[in-house]
Amino acid sequence: AGIGALRTVRSFNRCKLNGSDVTGLTRDPISTAQLVGSDLYIMTVDDNGPLFYRMKIDKSDKTELANFEINPASAVNGTIYYNGTQDNHYLYAMNTATDGVSTVWDGNLWYPIAQGDYIYYMDVENDYRLCRYSLSRNEIEVLTNERIDCFNVGYGYVYYQVNGEEACLKCMRDDGSDSWVIAEGNYTAIHMTSQYVYFQMFGETSTWYHSPLGSQSYSGFDGAREAALNAFKK
């Protein structure tokens, strides 16, 4: 590289809520990570293949749990819910107290998210439509027959990206009612807080957008970029 070239170092870090006291935890190429208590559950994929492991937030007690893909994104009350990626797409539950795994439901699902009594998921058998499964009643509800690429659920709403010629980011109530379009085009990285939903245009990682929860408007969000620049200046 010539003079002035920028070298990017990949690192998964821990910091305080105000952005201070940054500590590097690992340089593994992480696809998904989840914090449960004081343990991090990490999914990494590199040239050696996938690896799912657990370690403490102080980097100690690293324990390999699986050499295949497990997405730990959905964790509730010490249980990680995930879909199978080997012989089937069943719904599984990992008890983080013991790291034991049990089969919850022999469905055909992708990207499960637990909310109360329900597991929201993409229905693999039916062109990735959005459904929810009741854990207590063993019942399926179809929320939309549209093919979706990704989604997130929380605070009474579901935000989801519709695939196809009329691609758009949409919102509905978490029972499947009152759907509306937020933005036309292809969006991803949908994150939710109690006040806003945040998302990015597919293929464009430098810009974030946000929308007040339950609204029909959205705008650019520069807070993340400004925080990063301020941290760089220190």
Mark where each language-model region is.
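A short beta-strand motif characteristic of beta-propeller blades
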Residues: 20-26, 60-66, 99-105, 138-144, ...
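Residue position within the beta-strands of beta-propeller blades
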Residues: 1-5, 41-44, 81-83, 120-122, ...
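Eukaryotic tandem repeat interaction scaffolds
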Residues: 68, 76, 80-84, 89-92, ...
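Repeated scaffold domains used in trafficking and secretory/extracellular systems
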Residues: 27-37, 67-77, 106-116, 145-155, ...
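Blade-level signature of beta-propeller repeat domains, shared across WD40, Kelch, NHL, RCC1
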Residues: 186-234
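Short loop/turn segments that connect beta-strands within beta-propeller blades
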Residues: 16-20, 56-60, 94-99, 133-138, ...
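Acidic/polar residues in short coil/turn loops that connect beta-strands
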Residues: 18, 36, 58, 77, ...
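Structural motif
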Residues: 7-13, 48-54, 87-93, 126-132, ...
